[in-house]
Design a protein with these regions (language model features):
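Conserved alpha-helix/loop element of class I SAM-dependent methyltransferases that forms part
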Residues: 1-8
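A short acidic, Gly/Pro-enriched loop at the edge of an enzyme's catalytic core
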Residues: 63-74
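Conserved catalytic/acceptor-binding region of the Class I
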Residues: 94-165
Length: 225
């Protein structure tokens, strides 16, 4: 499809610490990252310097980027689509894409199968945070297609694949502590209690390291007319 080739002008929405924007820059793209969090983008700049790449960062909302019409060959949203006002962001992406440009919505989710580490971790999150309702995902997101179609994107495509991701116990605990259901929801004391229970669960149920945590990559792609 020729998406993200060297020389393409690309915009990474909800860039955070710049993982996707940095990867695009490493491919030779004219890469811009956009986020509402200045501290996260400052960390992204530090990581860019270590990687030896240059990315421009813009502090703005994905719903109102401030860029002129037909500015980009590629707009990408990784791990952030459902935090946005989706119809507004899809329309904004359509506005700022060049004719023939692409919007890519990507997700990378752990997959909770009965008794695996993701399943038992989710059950522990639900125990400590009953209001958390994001568990049980199959890692397939058809709503992305509706969002694209309603905003005028055509030639919609999806793909997905599974892979095991290796984590040490410490790294898995760190990822879960930073997740929306724990670090963004529990009190500092609650996070400590949760983390101790997760540490004990891993030691009892999954003592071997590294952990092999099943994940699913899903992407939806739409073309601007």
């Amino acid at each position: 499809m020729g998406i993200g080739r060297a020389g393409a002008r690309t915009l990474d929405l909800g860039t955070g610490t710049g993982t996707i924007a940095r990867s695009l820059a490493q491919r030779g793209c004219d890469s811009i990252g956009l986020d509402r969090s200045a501290p996260l983008m400052e960390e992204a700049r530090r990581m860019d310097r270590e990687a030896g790449v240059t990315v421009r960062y813009v502090e703005a909302a994905a719903e109102d980027t401030g860029f002129p019409e037909a500015s980009f060959d590629l707009v990408i949203a990784g791990q952030c689509w459902f935090w946005f006002d989706r119809p507004r962001v899809a329309s904004e992406a359509r506005r700022i894409l060049k004719p023939g440009g692409h919007l890519v919505i990507a997700h990378f989710d752990w997959i909770p199968l009965p008794g695996n580490v993701a399943d038992l971790t989710e059950k522990l999150i639900e125990k400590h945070n009953p209001k958390w309702k994001l568990g049980g995902s199959l890692g397939i997101h058809p709503r992305c297609l509706a969002d694209m179609a309603l905003s005028g994107f055509r030639r919609l495509e999806t793909f997905s694949f599974d892979l095991d991701v290796s984590y040490s116990h410490e790294a898995w605990r760190g990822r879960i502590r930073a997740s929306a259901g724990v670090g963004a929801s529990l009190s500092p004391e609650g996070v400590i209690v949760f983390d101790r229970e997760l540490q004990a669960l891993l030691a009892e149920k999954f003592p071997q390291e590294p952990l092999a945590v099943l994940h699913r990559v899903f992407a939806a792609i739409g073309k601007a007319a």
